Amino acid sequence: MTTAYKAGTDVTWRWGAHTARGRIEQVFTEPVARTIKGTEVRRNASPENPAYLVTQPRGGYALKSHSELEKDG
């Protein structure tokens, strides 16, 4: 079973040829949808693969699955 990250955890993920960074704001263990920059983003979250609403340093948001993220540092 996956150990979920907690709100406030700094994380990274691959974005094209780059690495993006952010901080977890909210944790979801059930399917979730959010509209980000006018696009509906969905994640099929579960206790085994939680989803996270992540804030980025420049103020943007991302909705990511646990399997997409790595703890920063």
Where are the model-predicted features located?
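Short beta-strand-centered aromatic/proline hotspots
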Residues: T19-V27
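Short, conserved beta-turn/loop elements at beta-strand boundaries and strand-helix junctions
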Residues: V27-A33
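Cytosolic, membrane-proximal regulatory domains of ion/volume homeostasis and mechanosensation machinery
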Residues: R34-R43
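Short, surface-exposed secondary-structure edge patches
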Residues: M1-A4, G16
